[in-house]
Amino acid sequence: MALGSDMGSRYSLRPEFYGGTRHIQEVWSMAEELGRQVFGAEFCSVAPLSGHVALMMALYASVPRGGKIACVDPGFAGYPGLDVDKIPQVLGYSVIKLPEKEMCIDVEEAVEMVSREKPHAVVLGASLILYPMPVQELAEMVHGYGGVVVYDASHVLGLVAGGVFQQPLKEGADIMLGSTHKSFFGPQGGIILTNDTRLAEKIEENTFHKFVDNIHFNRVAALAVALDEMRKHGKMYATRVVENAKTLAESLEKAGLKPFRNRLGYTFSHQVYLPYQVEEAAHVCNILEKNHIIADIGVRFGTCEVTRRGMGSKQMGQIAKLIALALDGADVKKDAVTLANRFKSIKYT
């Protein structure tokens, strides 16, 4: 209801520039306060229209033009927006790629590289994120030379909110940001959080008429609702999401497939990864979609939506069997639809 409300055609600025916007201002402040509560932060901005915009705003506030950033390689599992011809080109940054090992950042090599290169910001986050990032291991050293740690929680924001993944701000990240529609079950949009007063001020002063103007207050209202739901039910939701991901991975293995795992296990997040070469991955994705099972060209699976519809470990086993059968040539469309139709109501509200 909030997302489809009349606020979708209204806008406001602080201080109250437009008359008749008192209730919009109240909703705006409510969303920020809920964000501070849920994530344990002193500052929260709900102005970004996406996680991408939130990342640009965070970097603009912490890295000068001509500066250097370090990030997970976009060609490996990192965010494509940090490729050299994307955000870095727009904001005028050079980029170094953090070394990886078994789908994790290689901490020893990363510490050595960052100590040598001294990037203005180390961006920790990835599009394929199975395991926690080494925030604590890098933060003390980065802070020692005056750099900042920016944690892009876009994919794991709901798990952070639920307290079942790492807690970046407590571990030393200066800024945490993310999109609000992935593991966090809100509307499309972005959020920025920090406990650093100086960075908060820089983010605020560079927000309006630089990165955004109208911040879509129907979105802000819907985000406030989602934040309140997460405040009440986040722990239970996030716990079940991760449990379902682990069960799905184990069930895929039992069904004869080979989900990625390293010495830590299959996953600590909502994601499960089936590693294929690029051309084969596209074929796998296409087969699954024809059978009403949605993955991406990765091949990544996520357990957030099925969890929010009330599915548990039993259904993860059923889904794994359907995936294996489909990839073995069977037509499982009807079975997939039948399973989905048994779980139509939304939980954790």
Where do the protein language model's features map onto the residues?
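Conserved small-domain helix->loop->beta segment predominantly found in fold-type I
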Residues: 227, 238-302
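A short structural micro-motif
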Residues: 5-10, 210, 244, 248, ...
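PLP-dependent enzyme catalytic core of the Aspartate aminotransferase-like
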Residues: 243, 247, 299-349
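A structural signal for short secondary-structure junctions
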Residues: 16, 184, 264-268, 288-289, ...
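A common structural junction motif
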Residues: 211, 291-295, 327
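Conserved PLP-enzyme active-site core in the AAT-like
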Residues: 19-26, 30-258, 304-311
